[in-house]
Regions:
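Gram-negative bacterial Sec-dependent N-terminal signal peptides
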Residues: 4-19
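Glycine-rich anion/phosphate-binding loop at the beta-strand->alpha-helix junction
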Residues: 180, 230-296
Length: 296
């Protein structure tokens, strides 16, 4: 350190004296995978792939890539504007990289780009839904194993009708949730196909490497028909996903209905745990006027 100025030496020594955990940078936050995120990914990929394919001057590609990176970095700042359409994202790229950045749009359209980010976002949300559903089903199965010999009433038309094993009842609910999980897997396979490169309606004569683009964006396959990509699948796949969510809501709603029905009895057979946070999650609370009463 003999060549360092006194202030620099002091700073280095101070850094060396910090605890190990203080010297380690905080792990980077996961980016929000919204429309802005996917537009950025598509623009980065188009720059690289088109340069490799000879559709873009390789000497120009680094300048364009740096400009796109600055747009993405600016959009990732807290409270920053995050454009969600091609026509609002492009002016930012032109500002940072020059008008030449529009050359990466060869063979593209807002139609296939928007269809692509919708599919990518839907794919992410299906994965999140599947994870939460698996957690709920696992809890049902664990409770069923613990309550195989617990006898509870079952209801028809809102009236106690027959005694049953609580474990058997819960496994019935788990079976319904398992079918919902199967539907998610089947739908995911249809959603996990890239529309990128179909341009709009009739496709394009530009020699785009659609498979390379799909691989970069993490899609398992391609949407083969250009008209289907932006006009048909973009309409029916969200409806299919909505049907899955509705089915899950029906199963969960039936379970909640049973809990609420028996909770109104003088001697309910399920008591919800009190308290908030990790102890009860706010499932039930004491009446403000009648301390003997619990409200679900």
């Amino acid at each position: 350190m003999s060549g360092l100025k006194p202030l620099a030496t002091a700073l280095v020594l101070a850094a060396m004296a910090l605890p190990a955990h203080a010297q380690q940078p905080a792990p980077p936050k996961e980016p929000v995978r919204d429309e802005f995120f996917w537009l950025g990914e598509m623009n980065k990929a188009s720059t690289v792939i088109n340069a490799e394919q000879g559709l873009l001057d390789r000497a120009l590609a680094p300048k364009l890539a740096q400009g796109i990176a600055r747009v993405i970095e600016a959009g990732n700042q807290p409270g920053a504007r995050r454009p969600s359409t091609v026509i609002t994202f492009e002016p930012l790229m032109i500002k940072e990289a020059g008008v030449e950045v529009t050359l990466i749009h060869a063979g593209r359209s807002s139609q296939d780009m928007h269809a692509t980010y919708r599919a990518a976002i839907m794919r992410d949300r299906l994965l999140t839904l599947a994870e939460r559903l698996n957690q709920a089903t696992r809890t049902m199965v664990e409770l069923a194993a613990a309550h195989r010999d617990t006898v509870v009433p079952n209801y028809t038309n809102g009236v106690a009708a027959q005694p049953n094993s609580y474990g058997h009842y819960l496994l019935g609910l788990a079976a319904g949730l398992d079918r919902d999980a199967q539907r998610i897997r089947e739908t995911y396979a249809r959603v996990d196909r890239s529309p990128m490169g179909t341009t709009v309606l009739n496709g394009t004569s530009w020699p785009l490497d659609r498979q390379r683009m799909a691989d970069y964006l993490g899609f398992a396959g391609l949407v083969e028909n250009a008209y289907d990509a932006s006009q048909i699948a973009a309409a029916d796949l969200p409806v299919e996903v909505g049907g899955i969510v509705t089915g899950i809501a029906l199963h969960v709603g039936g379970f909640i209905e049973d809990v609420m029905t028996q909770y109104a009895q003088a001697r309910p057979w399920i008591l919800l745990r009190e308290g908030g946070g990790t102890t009860g999650g706010g499932n039930t609370y004491v009446s403000s006027a009648m301390p003997q009463k619990r409200n679900p």
